[in-house]
């Protein structure tokens, strides 16, 4: 059996068999529903920890967000127009500069531009995406604290 035969052309027969066995012979429909309820509760708790950390650590004068209603991602909008260099740099250049400062502070978020449907189009907003899917509560809190420190440094805001 060639790797290409079970990887890129169609869903893997092996993974389909494993999933079938799990759902049909072990969990059943009720077990799958129980798992979905469990993961929903887990994500809700993690989301709430992240939202609490955002309220505590992020500078609202240059950042905004809406609580996620589902899923595992949290989008953070940056008011790049308030950045000291906004008249001299493009949105993409500022996004990269801010992103690098965030990484230098030991936090990791995804640049919003990575998710544009048309990367060549002109964009006049700046977002970063964070996730709360797998990190322990204390790591979420620490990451958002570091994110806030990085944003304050970039925007020359007073420390909290």
Region locations from a protein language model:
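PLP-dependent class I/II
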Residues: 1-160
